[in-house]
Amino acid sequence: NKYCNIKCSKVAHTVCQYGESTKPSSKNCNKVSITSVGVTEEEKKLIVDEHNRFRQKVAQGLETRGNPGPQPAASDMNNLVWNDELAYIAQVWANQCQFFVHDKCRNTAQYQVGQNIAYSASTAAYPGIVSLIVLWENEVKDFNYSQGITKENFAKVGHYTQVVWAKTKEVGCGSIKYIEKGMKSHYLVCNYGPAGNYMGQPIYTKK
């Protein structure tokens, strides 16, 4: 397939490696009971709207949390739009059931691609997609804008910084819902183009 021509360092592209099917991997997914695969049209809209709501909140200087807070306003925050290709590649990876691991090569012909992963589970109902994105947003509480992204803080703030990375333009996500040990689990992989989270670059330009 065409993704075998996209090279990242020395690793095969996710879609080259695992094939073009968006069916869950029989090898890894048999440990859980999968109940649904992929994001609905409604969920797509919720993903884009929630990213843009939060990006605008930060851009307008309304985010009071931080270490220290508040976060400064931004002058260059793009509005994100949905990208089906990013979503497709994210879905192929989500379907491998390699939970909490990032794939090594997810770029498109157009973009270097970044990625956020989230998981939540409940006995009552599948956690909603917005609640998963909010987990990423909440990392703002540990972020120091003037310090930016460092090797030391990256594990604590890297999801937040990708969500609000000003130069990112598009997002596409894949998801699976499954039951494991009686828990209704929702696993979300979002891919971002162009990628954020470059060390030494500001996450956005201060207004």
Curated annotation (Swiss-Prot):
It is found in: Secreted. One of its GO terms (cellular component) is extracellular region. Expressed by the venom gland. SUPFAM superfamilies: PR-1-like. Its main location: secreted. Disulfide bonds join C4-C16, C8-C105, C29-C97, C173-C190. Residues 48-192 form the SCP domain. Keywords: Allergen, Disulfide bond, Secreted. Monomer. Belongs to the CRISP family. Venom allergen 5-like subfamily. This is Venom allergen 5. It comes from Polybia scutellaris rioplatensis.
